[in-house]
Protein backbone atom coordinates (compact mmCIF):
# COMPACT_ATOMS: atom_id res chain seq x y z
CA UNK A 1 0.00 0.00 0.00
CA UNK A 2 1.38 3.48 -0.85
CA UNK A 3 2.85 5.31 2.14
CA UNK A 4 0.64 8.05 3.54
CA UNK A 5 2.20 11.51 4.00
CA UNK A 6 3.74 12.34 7.39
CA UNK A 7 0.97 13.69 9.65
CA UNK A 8 2.99 16.69 10.84
CA UNK A 9 3.84 17.80 7.30
CA UNK A 10 0.20 17.33 6.27
CA UNK A 11 -0.89 19.47 9.22
CA UNK A 12 1.48 22.23 8.16
CA UNK A 13 0.30 22.00 4.56
CA UNK A 14 -3.38 22.14 5.44
CA UNK A 15 -3.18 24.99 7.90
CA UNK A 16 -1.74 27.26 5.21
CA UNK A 17 -4.39 26.50 2.58
CA UNK A 18 -6.71 29.33 1.58
CA UNK A 19 -9.66 26.96 1.97
CA UNK A 20 -8.72 26.19 5.59
CA UNK A 21 -8.62 29.73 6.94
CA UNK A 22 -11.08 31.20 9.45
CA UNK A 23 -13.55 33.70 8.02
CA UNK A 24 -13.50 36.87 10.17
CA UNK A 25 -17.04 37.75 9.07
CA UNK A 26 -18.68 34.63 10.51
CA UNK A 27 -17.00 34.06 13.87
CA UNK A 28 -20.19 35.12 15.66
CA UNK A 29 -22.67 32.83 13.92
CA UNK A 30 -22.83 30.35 16.80
CA UNK A 31 -24.61 33.09 18.80
CA UNK A 32 -26.49 34.70 15.89
CA UNK A 33 -30.20 34.49 15.08
CA UNK A 34 -31.32 32.32 12.18
CA UNK A 35 -31.86 35.38 9.98
CA UNK A 36 -28.40 36.72 10.78
CA UNK A 37 -26.82 33.33 9.99
CA UNK A 38 -28.58 33.36 6.62
CA UNK A 39 -27.54 36.96 5.99
CA UNK A 40 -23.88 36.09 6.61
CA UNK A 41 -24.06 33.09 4.28
CA UNK A 42 -25.82 35.11 1.59
CA UNK A 43 -23.30 37.96 1.84
CA UNK A 44 -20.41 35.54 1.44
CA UNK A 45 -22.13 33.77 -1.46
CA UNK A 46 -22.25 37.08 -3.36
CA UNK A 47 -18.45 36.86 -3.65
CA UNK A 48 -18.63 33.67 -5.71
CA UNK A 49 -19.79 34.95 -9.13
CA UNK A 50 -17.30 37.81 -8.91
CA UNK A 51 -14.47 35.32 -8.36
CA UNK A 52 -15.72 33.19 -11.25
CA UNK A 53 -15.92 36.22 -13.55
CA UNK A 54 -12.21 36.89 -13.00
CA UNK A 55 -11.51 33.42 -14.40
CA UNK A 56 -13.51 33.79 -17.62
CA UNK A 57 -10.42 33.91 -19.89
CA UNK A 58 -9.21 30.61 -18.42
CA UNK A 59 -12.69 29.07 -18.61
CA UNK A 60 -12.80 30.08 -22.29
CA UNK A 61 -9.48 28.27 -22.86
CA UNK A 62 -10.95 25.18 -21.22
CA UNK A 63 -14.06 25.32 -23.39
CA UNK A 64 -11.99 25.50 -26.59
CA UNK A 65 -10.04 22.42 -25.49
CA UNK A 66 -13.24 20.50 -24.73
CA UNK A 67 -14.87 21.50 -28.03
CA UNK A 68 -11.80 20.38 -29.97
CA UNK A 69 -11.87 17.04 -28.16
CA UNK A 70 -15.59 16.54 -28.78
CA UNK A 71 -15.17 17.33 -32.47
CA UNK A 72 -12.57 14.55 -32.61
CA UNK A 73 -14.97 12.15 -30.86
CA UNK A 74 -13.15 12.56 -27.55
CA UNK A 75 -14.68 12.63 -24.08
CA UNK A 76 -14.57 14.82 -20.99
CA UNK A 77 -13.81 13.21 -17.64
CA UNK A 78 -14.38 15.09 -14.39
CA UNK A 79 -12.35 13.71 -11.48
CA UNK A 80 -13.04 14.72 -7.90
CA UNK A 81 -13.58 13.59 -4.32
CA UNK A 82 -16.42 14.41 -1.94
CA UNK A 83 -18.44 17.46 -2.95
CA UNK A 84 -16.16 18.17 -5.91
CA UNK A 85 -16.62 14.64 -7.22
CA UNK A 86 -20.39 14.80 -6.79
CA UNK A 87 -20.55 18.06 -8.70
CA UNK A 88 -18.70 16.43 -11.59
CA UNK A 89 -21.12 13.51 -11.56
CA UNK A 90 -24.11 15.88 -11.50
CA UNK A 91 -22.88 17.95 -14.44
CA UNK A 92 -22.03 14.85 -16.46
CA UNK A 93 -25.39 13.20 -15.77
CA UNK A 94 -27.33 16.28 -16.92
CA UNK A 95 -25.72 16.44 -20.37
CA UNK A 96 -27.66 13.57 -22.03
CA UNK A 97 -31.18 14.83 -21.22
CA UNK A 98 -30.27 18.47 -21.84
CA UNK A 99 -28.14 18.18 -24.97
CA UNK A 100 -28.89 14.71 -26.32
CA UNK A 101 -25.32 13.54 -25.85
CA UNK A 102 -24.22 9.95 -25.37
CA UNK A 103 -23.76 9.24 -21.62
CA UNK A 104 -20.14 8.34 -22.41
CA UNK A 105 -19.37 11.83 -23.75
CA UNK A 106 -19.11 13.53 -20.34
CA UNK A 107 -18.36 11.33 -17.34
CA UNK A 108 -17.82 11.95 -13.65
CA UNK A 109 -15.28 9.94 -11.67
CA UNK A 110 -15.48 10.20 -7.88
CA UNK A 111 -13.05 8.83 -5.32
CA UNK A 112 -14.67 5.82 -3.68
CA UNK A 113 -16.83 4.98 -6.69
CA UNK A 114 -20.60 5.12 -7.08
CA UNK A 115 -21.29 4.61 -3.38
CA UNK A 116 -19.41 7.84 -2.62
CA UNK A 117 -22.04 9.83 -4.53
CA UNK A 118 -24.54 9.08 -1.76
CA UNK A 119 -22.36 8.50 1.29
CA UNK A 120 -18.91 9.83 2.14
CA UNK A 121 -16.12 7.29 1.69
CA UNK A 122 -13.50 8.58 4.08
CA UNK A 123 -9.93 7.93 2.99
CA UNK A 124 -10.85 7.14 -0.62
CA UNK A 125 -9.23 10.38 -1.76
CA UNK A 126 -5.87 9.92 -0.03
CA UNK A 127 -4.00 7.74 -2.53
CA UNK A 128 -2.80 9.31 -5.82
CA UNK A 129 -2.45 5.94 -7.54
CA UNK A 130 -6.18 5.34 -7.19
CA UNK A 131 -6.85 8.38 -9.35
CA UNK A 132 -4.60 6.99 -12.06
CA UNK A 133 -6.26 3.57 -11.76
CA UNK A 134 -9.69 5.15 -12.17
CA UNK A 135 -8.65 6.68 -15.50
CA UNK A 136 -7.24 3.36 -16.66
CA UNK A 137 -10.53 1.71 -15.75
CA UNK A 138 -12.40 4.12 -18.03
CA UNK A 139 -10.00 3.62 -20.92
CA UNK A 140 -9.01 7.29 -21.13
CA UNK A 141 -6.97 8.07 -24.27
CA UNK A 142 -5.03 11.01 -25.68
CA UNK A 143 -8.22 12.10 -27.49
CA UNK A 144 -10.02 12.77 -24.19
CA UNK A 145 -9.87 15.63 -21.69
CA UNK A 146 -9.40 15.12 -17.94
CA UNK A 147 -10.64 17.86 -15.61
CA UNK A 148 -9.59 17.62 -11.97
CA UNK A 149 -11.82 19.31 -9.39
CA UNK A 150 -10.46 19.98 -5.90
CA UNK A 151 -11.15 22.98 -3.69
CA UNK A 152 -7.79 22.63 -1.94
CA UNK A 153 -5.87 21.94 -5.15
CA UNK A 154 -4.07 19.08 -3.42
CA UNK A 155 -6.49 16.12 -3.13
CA UNK A 156 -4.19 13.13 -3.85
CA UNK A 157 -6.79 11.13 -5.84
CA UNK A 158 -7.42 14.11 -8.12
CA UNK A 159 -3.81 15.22 -8.47
CA UNK A 160 -2.80 11.63 -9.22
CA UNK A 161 -5.41 11.38 -11.97
CA UNK A 162 -4.44 14.68 -13.59
CA UNK A 163 -0.71 13.91 -13.49
CA UNK A 164 -1.34 10.45 -14.96
CA UNK A 165 -3.48 11.97 -17.71
CA UNK A 166 -0.80 14.52 -18.54
CA UNK A 167 2.32 12.37 -18.23
CA UNK A 168 1.25 8.81 -19.07
CA UNK A 169 -1.75 9.29 -21.37
CA UNK A 170 -0.78 12.61 -22.93
CA UNK A 171 -4.29 14.06 -23.05
CA UNK A 172 -5.27 17.67 -22.31
CA UNK A 173 -5.81 18.44 -18.63
CA UNK A 174 -7.86 21.03 -16.77
CA UNK A 175 -8.02 21.77 -13.06
CA UNK A 176 -10.76 23.61 -11.15
CA UNK A 177 -9.80 24.80 -7.67
CA UNK A 178 -10.51 27.69 -5.32
CA UNK A 179 -6.97 28.38 -4.16
CA UNK A 180 -4.71 30.98 -5.81
CA UNK A 181 -3.10 29.80 -9.04
CA UNK A 182 0.43 30.22 -7.68
CA UNK A 183 -0.31 27.76 -4.85
CA UNK A 184 -1.35 24.93 -7.18
CA UNK A 185 1.10 22.01 -7.10
CA UNK A 186 -0.16 20.23 -10.22
CA UNK A 187 0.56 21.71 -13.67
CA UNK A 188 -2.49 21.27 -15.96
CA UNK A 189 -2.92 22.78 -19.41
CA UNK A 190 -5.52 25.15 -17.97
CA UNK A 191 -6.09 26.00 -14.31
CA UNK A 192 -9.36 27.67 -13.32
CA UNK A 193 -8.98 29.27 -9.90
CA UNK A 194 -11.92 31.32 -8.60
CA UNK A 195 -10.61 32.35 -5.18
CA UNK A 196 -13.72 32.72 -3.03
CA UNK A 197 -12.02 33.23 0.33
CA UNK A 198 -12.54 31.39 3.64
CA UNK A 199 -15.80 29.54 4.11
CA UNK A 200 -18.53 30.66 6.54
CA UNK A 201 -17.84 27.41 8.39
CA UNK A 202 -14.07 27.00 8.35
CA UNK A 203 -13.02 24.32 5.87
CA UNK A 204 -16.57 23.48 4.72
CA UNK A 205 -15.80 23.68 1.02
CA UNK A 206 -19.25 22.34 0.10
CA UNK A 207 -20.29 25.99 0.52
CA UNK A 208 -18.66 28.81 -1.51
CA UNK A 209 -16.06 26.57 -3.11
CA UNK A 210 -18.69 24.07 -4.20
CA UNK A 211 -20.88 26.85 -5.57
CA UNK A 212 -17.96 28.25 -7.58
CA UNK A 213 -17.13 24.82 -8.97
CA UNK A 214 -20.76 24.26 -10.01
CA UNK A 215 -20.80 27.59 -11.86
CA UNK A 216 -17.57 26.74 -13.67
CA UNK A 217 -18.70 23.25 -14.69
CA UNK A 218 -22.01 24.68 -15.92
CA UNK A 219 -20.07 27.12 -18.08
CA UNK A 220 -17.69 24.53 -19.53
CA UNK A 221 -20.31 22.05 -20.72
CA UNK A 222 -22.96 24.61 -21.66
CA UNK A 223 -20.58 26.74 -23.75
CA UNK A 224 -19.11 23.63 -25.37
CA UNK A 225 -22.55 22.31 -26.30
CA UNK A 226 -23.59 25.68 -27.72
CA UNK A 227 -20.47 25.69 -29.87
CA UNK A 228 -21.37 22.21 -31.10
CA UNK A 229 -24.82 23.28 -32.29
CA UNK A 230 -26.82 21.74 -29.45
CA UNK A 231 -28.72 25.01 -28.92
CA UNK A 232 -30.82 27.13 -31.31
CA UNK A 233 -31.32 30.70 -30.11
CA UNK A 234 -31.24 29.83 -26.39
CA UNK A 235 -33.33 26.67 -26.54
CA UNK A 236 -32.51 22.99 -26.13
CA UNK A 237 -32.97 21.47 -29.56
CA UNK A 238 -31.08 18.21 -29.05
CA UNK A 239 -32.86 17.20 -25.86
CA UNK A 240 -33.92 13.60 -25.42
CA UNK A 241 -37.64 13.27 -24.83
CA UNK A 242 -37.19 10.81 -21.97
CA UNK A 243 -39.91 12.16 -19.66
CA UNK A 244 -43.33 13.76 -19.98
CA UNK A 245 -41.80 17.12 -19.10
CA UNK A 246 -39.22 16.84 -21.88
CA UNK A 247 -41.85 15.70 -24.39
CA UNK A 248 -43.86 18.82 -23.64
CA UNK A 249 -40.75 21.00 -23.71
CA UNK A 250 -39.94 19.68 -27.18
CA UNK A 251 -43.42 20.58 -28.41
CA UNK A 252 -43.24 24.00 -26.80
CA UNK A 253 -39.83 24.68 -28.34
CA UNK A 254 -41.15 23.92 -31.83
CA UNK A 255 -44.17 26.14 -31.17
CA UNK A 256 -42.07 29.05 -29.91
CA UNK A 257 -39.52 28.95 -32.74
CA UNK A 258 -41.91 28.35 -35.63
CA UNK A 259 -45.19 29.88 -34.48
CA UNK A 260 -47.25 26.75 -35.18
CA UNK A 261 -49.90 25.55 -32.72
CA UNK A 262 -49.63 22.62 -30.30
CA UNK A 263 -51.24 20.02 -32.56
CA UNK A 264 -49.11 21.00 -35.57
CA UNK A 265 -45.90 20.88 -33.53
CA UNK A 266 -46.83 17.50 -32.08
CA UNK A 267 -47.68 16.12 -35.53
CA UNK A 268 -44.38 17.19 -37.08
CA UNK A 269 -42.42 15.81 -34.12
CA UNK A 270 -44.24 12.50 -34.51
CA UNK A 271 -43.17 12.35 -38.17
CA UNK A 272 -39.50 12.87 -37.27
CA UNK A 273 -39.34 10.54 -34.25
CA UNK A 274 -39.49 13.42 -31.78
CA UNK A 275 -36.27 15.08 -32.98
CA UNK A 276 -36.69 18.79 -32.33
CA UNK A 277 -33.94 19.92 -34.72
CA UNK A 278 -35.48 18.01 -37.60
CA UNK A 279 -38.92 19.39 -36.83
CA UNK A 280 -37.61 22.96 -36.85
CA UNK A 281 -35.91 22.53 -40.23
CA UNK A 282 -38.98 20.82 -41.70
CA UNK A 283 -41.26 23.69 -40.73
CA UNK A 284 -39.00 26.70 -41.25
CA UNK A 285 -37.41 25.46 -44.49
CA UNK A 286 -40.65 23.84 -45.67
CA UNK A 287 -39.01 20.50 -46.46
CA UNK A 288 -39.79 16.85 -45.78
CA UNK A 289 -38.18 14.66 -43.13
CA UNK A 290 -35.45 13.18 -45.31
CA UNK A 291 -34.38 16.57 -46.66
CA UNK A 292 -34.33 18.08 -43.17
CA UNK A 293 -32.13 15.24 -41.95
CA UNK A 294 -29.84 15.58 -44.96
CA UNK A 295 -29.39 19.29 -44.29
CA UNK A 296 -28.63 18.71 -40.63
CA UNK A 297 -26.06 16.06 -41.56
CA UNK A 298 -24.46 18.50 -44.00
CA UNK A 299 -24.25 21.26 -41.36
CA UNK A 300 -22.99 18.99 -38.55
CA UNK A 301 -26.27 19.42 -36.71
CA UNK A 302 -26.37 23.22 -36.71
CA UNK A 303 -29.98 24.32 -37.15
CA UNK A 304 -29.52 27.87 -38.46
CA UNK A 305 -27.52 27.03 -41.61
CA UNK A 306 -29.72 23.96 -42.19
CA UNK A 307 -32.81 26.18 -42.29
CA UNK A 308 -31.11 28.66 -44.60
CA UNK A 309 -29.79 25.92 -46.88
CA UNK A 310 -26.24 27.18 -46.29
CA UNK A 311 -24.41 23.85 -46.55
From Swiss-Prot:
Protein name (Swiss-Prot/TrEMBL): N-acetylmuramic acid 6-phosphate etherase
The protein's enzyme class: lyase
Misc. comment: A lyase-type mechanism (elimination/hydration) is suggested for the cleavage of the lactyl ether bond of MurNAc 6-phosphate, with the formation of an alpha,beta-unsaturated aldehyde intermediate with (E)-stereochemistry, followed by the syn addition of water to give product.
Quaternary structure note: Homodimer.
Functional pathway: Amino-sugar metabolism; N-acetylmuramate degradation
EC number from the UniProt entry: 4.2.1.126
Chemical reaction(s) catalysed: N-acetyl-D-muramate 6-phosphate + H2O = N-acetyl-D-glucosamine 6-phosphate + (R)-lactate
Family (UniProt): Belongs to the GCKR-like family. MurNAc-6-P etherase subfamily.
Active site: 94 (proton donor), 125
GO process annotations (BP): amino sugar catabolic process; N-acetylmuramic acid catabolic process; peptidoglycan turnover
Domain SIS: 66-230
